[in-house]
A protein has these predicted regions:
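N-terminal active-site segment of His-dependent metallophosphoesterases
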Residues: 1-70
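His/Asp/Glu-rich metal-coordinating catalytic cores
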Residues: 50, 61-136
Length: 136
């Protein structure tokens, strides 16, 4: 049996400007990060082989170093899980471009399409969301 978690629209590092005070927004951002860690704990407990993140991992093109470091370190801490990432309309193709050492278990799709084999029973194929400008 193949166990895969599909998640999307995490919107990590959101500013939460419209509804919260600065302190409430920071508290909410921390809760988002803890929810990600809880998802990973669930994945470990259930012996999940892969996690597919289908868009809008982050809320804007500019991601704080703290959030990026947290996200990448949590992936590195779980080499037994393969992570597959498709950009959404809030993500940018530069999201991971300047990261020097991406975890070996993080697989990025592209707007040209890409395929990854999780094991002998599951092939993941995807085409990322592309902006109008990227499509030209």
């Amino acid at each position: 049996m193949v166990k895969l978690i599909h998640t999307a629209d995490l919107h990590l590092d959101s500013a939460f400007r419209s509804r919260f005070t600065k302190e409430e927004a920071e508290n909410r951002r921390q809760k988002q990060l803890m929810a990600w860690k809880e998802l990973l704990s669930f994945a470990v407990e259930k012996k999940v082989q892969g996690i597919l993140i289908a868009g809008d991992l982050f809320d804007s093109p500019v991601v704080s170093h703290g959030t990026m470091d947290f996200f990448l370190s949590t992936i590195s801490e779980h080499p037994e899980i393969s992570f597959f990432y498709l950009r959404g309309n809030h993500d940018t193709e530069n999201t991971f471009r300047y990261q020097e050492n991406l975890p070996k278990n993080l697989f990025l799709f592209s707007d040209k399409g890409k395929k990854y084999r999780l094991n002998d029973r599951l092939l993941l194929a995807g085409v990322e969301y592309g902006t109008e400008e990227e499509s030209k």
